[in-house]
């Protein structure tokens, strides 16, 4: 729990209000969110001039310093303005004019920290954001290399959360690949912040005191649990098992997970009850469809 008030759910996103501490806690602790974006402006625009003026009116100087590097990216949907490259150019031009006038310069060097601007134009409504995360939050920092069909860490965490797992049950991923599902289960069991081993774009922002991030990391560390957990990851590829063990070590949860090389349709399990969470081969990248169908049938008989 992040103890953040005023939370509102919309299609594909969650909105909340808060200060710099809330922003840092969200980046550090969100398991299934992909980015934490700060809303800078919200306005209607059906023409390039309206888009320009909306961005130009935004107090960008409160967030982007004189030497800030502010690239622009975004997307458009069901709107009069549908050309993303043109909208990018307009947003960049308006932001440059605003910042240049506020700082009294005709040219902005953009040699400092990165302040990624994003825009969303949907149904003629423009929202301008500042990306505080940097690389997507699925990049926890523990998986340097994945297998041939890696599962995003955020999706793996969501799968574990859907089972309401809290560390008490036996958990088995019979097709663990690079170990993402068992590792995310262990992070949840330990109450370990998923962002503990990575950095965020917001750590370089001039308007956020560095102590905020240090305090948030210390707070997250204090909330970790220590215990014995029954989490098993298995795969019939020894290379995947070696990779899983290495990733679990980097995530700081190697002591919480057992990894085993073996056939999921024949493996003896250490528990009669528990939860199976997996991303099985489905006949696209890892094997043929007929082979996947035979695997499902054999696996179903084995665990019945």
Where would I find each of the regions flagged by the language model?
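Glycine-rich S-adenosyl-L-methionine
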Residues: 287-303
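Non-catalytic nucleic-acid substrate-recognition regions in nucleic-acid-modifying enzymes
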Residues: 2-115
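S-adenosyl-L-methionine
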Residues: 4-34, 76-86, 121-168, 183, ...
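Residue-level signal for inorganic ion chemistry
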Residues: 72, 119, 279, 299
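A short acidic, Gly/Pro-enriched loop at the edge of an enzyme's catalytic core
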Residues: 265-277
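Conserved S-adenosyl-L-methionine
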Residues: 151-268, 285, 291
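Low-complexity, glycine/alanine/valine/leucine- and proline-rich hydrophobic stretches
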Residues: 259-260, 276-278
């Amino acid at each position: 729990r992040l103890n953040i008030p005023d939370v509102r759910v919309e299609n594909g996103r969650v909105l909340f209000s808060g200060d710099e501490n809330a922003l840092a806690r969200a980046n550090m602790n969100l398991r299934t969110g992909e980015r934490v974006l700060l809303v800078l402006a919200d306005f209607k625009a059906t023409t390039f001039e309206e888009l320009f003026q909306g961005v130009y009116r935004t107090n960008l100087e409160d967030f982007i310093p004189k030497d800030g590097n502010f690239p622009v990216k975004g997307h458009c949907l069901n709107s009069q303005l549908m050309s993303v490259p043109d909208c990018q150019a307009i947003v960049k031009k308006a932001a440059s004019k605003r910042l240049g006038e506020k700082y009294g310069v005709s040219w902005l060097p953009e040699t400092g920290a990165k302040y990624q601007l994003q825009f969303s134009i949907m149904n003629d409504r423009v929202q301008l954001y500042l990306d505080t995360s940097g690389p997507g939050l699925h990049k926890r920092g523990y998986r340097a290399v994945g297998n041939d069909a890696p599962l995003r860490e955020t999706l793996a965490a969501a799968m574990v959360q859907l089972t309401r797992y809290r560390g008490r049950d036996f958990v088995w991923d019979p097709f663990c690949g690079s170990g993402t599902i068992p590792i995310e289960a262990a992070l949840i069991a330990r109450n370990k912040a998923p962002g503990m081993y990575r950095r965020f774009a917001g750590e370089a922002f001039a308007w956020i005191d560095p102590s905020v991030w240090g305090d948030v990391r210390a707070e997250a560390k204090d909330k970790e649990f220590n215990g014995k957990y029954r989490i098993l990851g298995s795969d019939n590829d020894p290379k995947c098992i070696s990779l899983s063990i290495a990733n679990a070590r980097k995530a700081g949860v190697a002591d919480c997970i057992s990894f085993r090389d073996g056939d999921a349709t024949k493996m003896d399990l250490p528990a009669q009850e528990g939860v199976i969470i997996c991303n099985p081969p489905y006949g696209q990248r890892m094997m043929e469809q007929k082979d996947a169908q035979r695997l499902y049938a054999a696996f179903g008989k084995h665990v019945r």
